[in-house]
Amino acid sequence: MAKKGMINRELKREKTVAKYAAKRAELKATIANVNATDEERFDAMLKLQALPRNASPVRLRNRCGLTGRPHGYFRKFGLSRNKLRDTVMQGDVPGVVKASW
């Protein structure tokens, strides 16, 4: 089980990313716009750099929904490999069966 502080930190990052998503997209569009003047693009770059670091979606980490474990994460299920195995063996995940050949 991950520390509660780490899980809370990740939730805080998710909220920050959602809060600044529109502003980041607008600034990035201005920077990528070829028709914008150099001054506008430079100002947009400075404003983008002034945003909080945790506003960038790159800083998010996928974590297990049950334990908060950051490694061995399966996106399709939202669980780590350990908890995925446990839930599949209990029959809690529909459509998943143990491999047999």
Swiss-Prot record:
One of its GO terms (molecular function) is rRNA binding. SUPFAM superfamilies: Glucocorticoid receptor-like (DNA-binding domain). GO terms for cellular component: cytoplasm; small ribosomal subunit. Keywords: Ribonucleoprotein, Ribosomal protein, RNA-binding, rRNA-binding. The keyword Metal-binding does not apply. Signal peptide: none annotated. InterPro entries: Ribosomal_uS14, Ribosomal_uS14_bac/plastid, Ribosomal_uS14_CS. GO terms for biological process: translation. Pfam families: Ribosomal_S14. PROSITE patterns: RIBOSOMAL_S14. Binds 16S rRNA, required for the assembly of 30S particles and may also be responsible for determining the conformation of the 16S rRNA at the A site. Belongs to the universal ribosomal protein uS14 family. Part of the 30S ribosomal subunit. Contacts proteins S3 and S10. This is Small ribosomal subunit protein uS14.
